[in-house]
Regions:
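Short, hydrophobic alpha-helix immediately C-terminal to the catalytic nucleophile
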Residues: 103-107
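Gly/Ala-rich beta-loop-alpha elbow adjacent to hydrolase catalytic centers
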Residues: 93-102
Length: 250
């Protein structure tokens, strides 16, 4: 479930690439990627992002309106699988505003529809507790980059509900995106090392959000954790991560 500023016509390749990466990484936990299907749900009107009407991101109505449709879509996937005798693990991942939208949908979806729910860089959980989700106990997850993602929990609790990091009974996945080629060190070190004055000004203003879009980047521990859950596994252990990095020649 994508973020603010998402448009099917301009962002399709980005999400196709993300989907392929998530599929490929399931091989690290012994799953054949050819047995994995990934979907980017773009059938909702997302608030505009930077360069557009950014104030729309403060409006919860976009999430409220989209949540029932997402819930019905997920129920349709499950019903189709059941009708055709296909058993599958269904994992929903929501990023930023999309995680709040998905969270609201998970309170409405029929039980037995979704097996795992992951929120990353979340404005708010769309619920006050994991008990409100129609998700099996122990199968709700969150991922939060420690630096450069001030979006986490930014939405007011009265509308966006609890910051996922503070939800009881939630499983915390890795927030490590330092292996992303897009990862930046927030604060003075990064600004001092950029050589373009105008870029410096932009980075100072945007520093709190520099790493908000790095969760799904190829090679990150966050995206590997997501792939593990998709494959029905657990988050990446330190030993497994070391083995992956050795395989990649790091």
């Amino acid at each position: 479930m994508p973020d603010i500023g998402t448009h099917a016509d301009g962002d399709l390749k980005k999400y196709m690439d993300t989907n392929e990466n998530l599929k490929a990484q399931t091989a690290q936990v012994g799953t054949n990627p050819h047995n994995v299907a990934t979907i980017s749900y773009l059938e909702y009107v997302a608030p505009e992002g930077l360069g557009g009407k950014i104030y729309q991101a403060a409006n919860i109505s976009y999430a409220d309106e989209a949540a029932p449709d997402l819930a019905h879509f997920e129920e349709g996937l499950r019903a189709s699988g059941n009708t055709n005798g296909h058993s599958f693990t269904n994992t929903v991942i929501g990023h930023s505003y999309g995680s709040t939208t998905a969270g609201k949908a998970m309170t409405q979806v029929a039980e037995g529809t979704v097996d795992n729910f992951i929120m990353c860089g979340s404005l708010g959980a769309g619920a006050e507790s994991t008990d409100q989700y129609n998700i099996p106990e122990g199968h709700v997850y969150e991922s939060s980059v420690p630096e450069g993602d001030a979006v986490q929990g930014l939405g007011p609790d009265t509308e966006y509900d609890t910051n996922p990091k503070k939800l009881a009974a939630i499983t915390h996945l890795s927030g490590d995106t330092t292996d992303s080629e897009n990862y930046k060190i927030p604060g003075e070190d990064y600004v001092r090392n950029t050589g373009h004055p105008f870029k410096q000004a932009a980075d100072i203003l945007g520093a709190p959000f520099l790493n908000h879009d790095t969760y799904f980047d190829e090679g990150t521990r966050t995206s590997q954790d997501f792939s593990n859950i998709i494959a029905g596994g657990k988050q990446t252990t330190d030993d497994k991560r070391a083995a992956i990095e050795m395989e990649r020649g790091k």
